[in-house]
């Protein structure tokens, strides 16, 4: 598994092209699987289940339609994105459901390292925390699979400007809010977070 970490924001359309090409390379066995850590410039994306009324304004940031599962979400500075391109065929026990659950376990264990108690909710796909008596999402999931190879992935709010979510109903869920590591009192940079992400990934995906 190769790891690629970007130091500058990656334009969304370029990231999509890169992932599609990488999936083909993995399928053809000419390129290795990849975990790609990056951030985007501020934007909204609409998954395959997004409804027009969940986009409250299109004047804040660019809006991209994407083939991943899910509804509307936000990407931008302070949010660590992990795009995982993995060949499920190469893992006898790893079906789609187990893959998504293992992604959840990965993020939960990463956050635990920073003393954040969280949980993966399979019904409201994502990783959640209980903050001041209310449930809030700290990590969103959006997955696509082609030729049994995964792409897209997970976005974790590290020091995200949460006001940027105001233009959408995040993931189509009105009842619950959004939070970040910074809001929870954990002030870290990507470099520290990435080290833990890689360490925990290698642990949880050893059985997938």
Swiss-Prot record:
The enzyme's E.C. designation: 2.3.1.181
Q: Would I find Manganese among this entry's keywords?
A: no
Q: What GO terms describe the biological role, i.e. biological process, of this protein?
A: protein modification process
Pathway the protein contributes to: Protein modification; protein lipoylation via endogenous pathway; protein N(6)-(lipoyl)lysine from octanoyl-[acyl-carrier-protein]: step 1/2
Q: Which PROSITE patterns match?
A: BPL_LPL_CATALYTIC, LIPB
Where does the record place the site Lowers pKa of active site Cys? 137
Identify the keywords attached in UniProt to this record, alphabetized.
Acyltransferase, Cytoplasm, Transferase
Enumerate the subcellular locations listed in this protein's record, separating them with semicolons: Cytoplasm
Report whether Cytoplasm shows up as a keyword of the record. yes
Residues binding substrate, per UniProt? 68-75, 140-142, 153-155
Entry annotation: catalytic residues: 171 (acyl-thioester intermediate)
Which Gene Ontology terms of cellular component type are present? cytoplasm
Question: Which InterPro entries does this chain map to?
Answer: aa-tRNA-synth_II/BPL/LPL, BPL_LPL_catalytic, Octanoyltransferase, Octanoyltransferase_CS
Q: Where does the signal sequence lie?
A: none
* Other facts: In the reaction, the free carboxyl group of octanoic acid is attached via an amide linkage to the epsilon-amino group of a specific lysine residue of lipoyl domains of lipoate-dependent enzymes.
Family recorded in the similarity comment: Belongs to the LipB family.
Q: What is this protein called?
A: Octanoyltransferase
The species is: Ehrlichia ruminantium (strain Gardel)
User: Source organism lineage?
Assistant: Bacteria, Pseudomonadati, Pseudomonadota, Alphaproteobacteria, Rickettsiales
Q: Which gene encodes it?
A: lipB
């Amino acid at each position: 598994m190769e790891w690629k970490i970007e130091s500058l924001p990656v334009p969304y359309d370029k990231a999509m092209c890169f992932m599609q090409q990488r999936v083909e390379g993995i399928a053809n066995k000419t390129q290795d699987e990849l975990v790609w850590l990056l951030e985007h410039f501020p934007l909204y994306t609409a998954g395959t289940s997004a409804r027009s009324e969940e986009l409250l304004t299109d004047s804040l940031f660019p809006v991209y339609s994407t083939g991943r599962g899910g509804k509307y979400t936000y990407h931008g500075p302070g949010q660590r994105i992990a795009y995982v391109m993995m060949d499920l065929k190469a893992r006898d026990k790893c079906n789609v459901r187990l893959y998504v659950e293992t992604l959840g376990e990965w993020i939960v264990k990463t956050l635990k390292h920073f003393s954040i108690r969280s949980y993966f909710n399979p019904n409201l796909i994502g990783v959640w925390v209980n903050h001041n008596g209310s449930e809030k999402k700290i990590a969103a999931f959006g997955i696509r699979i082609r030729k049994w190879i995964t792409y897209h992935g997970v976005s974790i709010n590290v020091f995200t400007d949460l006001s940027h979510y105001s233009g959408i109903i995040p993931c189509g869920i009105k009842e619950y809010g959004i939070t970040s590591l910074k809001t929870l009192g954990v002030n870290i940079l990507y470099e520290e977070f990435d080290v833990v992400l890689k360490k925990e990934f290698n642990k949880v995906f050893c059985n997938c």
